[in-house]
Design a protein with these regions (language model features):
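Catalytic core of pol beta-like nucleotidyltransferases
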Residues: 1-36, 47-54, 64-175
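Short beta-strand->loop micro-motif that forms the acidic, two-metal-ion catalytic signature
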Residues: 59-63
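Conserved G/P- and acidic residue-centered "switch" motifs that form tight phosphate/ATP-binding loops
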Residues: 44, 58
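Short, glycine- and small/hydrophobic-rich beta-strand elements in well-ordered beta-sheets
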Residues: 36-42
Length: 175
């Protein structure tokens, strides 16, 4: 059966009330990070459109001139998060318990194909993407997966990937 690359580009593909807070987050990132913001990508249940009221918002943020420390990167994100706190608190008062779960990578780190990208080729929403950086990463990965004959198999509400149909034990598959 295979898979069809079907990630989307544009915040309009995110359902409310998440869309408003993600637009606010995008604007805050642009304001604080400026030209150092490369990409903002939403993935997971919010991107798929099946988020619950208590779902976290999974984010991939790609930036330039980031500190090496993961904790320092999170501090940079917290600076941005403070700017959207009123939006988040407003949603909490409406019964939407939103928390952000960011993965923050520099450009070189983001270029390397990561297992988390597998599902992104199918259901991510790219909200901001300077010079189509992350779109190119996902297109490259999609091409590789299609060349391998990869399949995303569904079992009830869950799924898994078969990267190569004729896989032999011990064989290394590079994506």
């Amino acid at each position: 059966m295979g898979f069809t690359p079907s990630y989307k580009v544009g915040v309009e593909f995110i359902n409310e009330p998440y869309r408003s807070v993600i637009q606010g987050l995008r604007n805050a990132l642009i304001s604080v990070w400026g030209d150092n913001l490369v990409s903002l990508v939403v993935f997971g249940s919010v991107a798929r459109g099946d988020a619950r009221r208590d779902s976290d918002v999974d984010l991939l943020i790609v930036g330039k001139q980031l500190p090496k420390s993961r904790f320092k990167r999170l501090e940079l994100f917290e600076e941005v998060e403070k700017l959207v706190e009123p939006l988040v608190e407003g949603l909490w008062s409406q019964g939407y318990y939103i928390d952000f779960t960011p993965i923050i990578l520099d450009v070189e780190e983001a270029r390397r194909h990561r297992p988390i990208y597998l599902d992104m080729v199918v259901d991510a929403v790219i909200v901001f993407d300077r010079d189509d950086f992350f779109r190119k990463v996902l297109d490259e990965l999609s091409s590789r997966l299609l060349a391998l004959g990869a399949e995303r198999k569904r079992v009830g509400k869950l799924w898994y990937w078969v990267l190569k149909k004729d896989y032999r034990p011990g064989e290394v598959i590079e994506i």
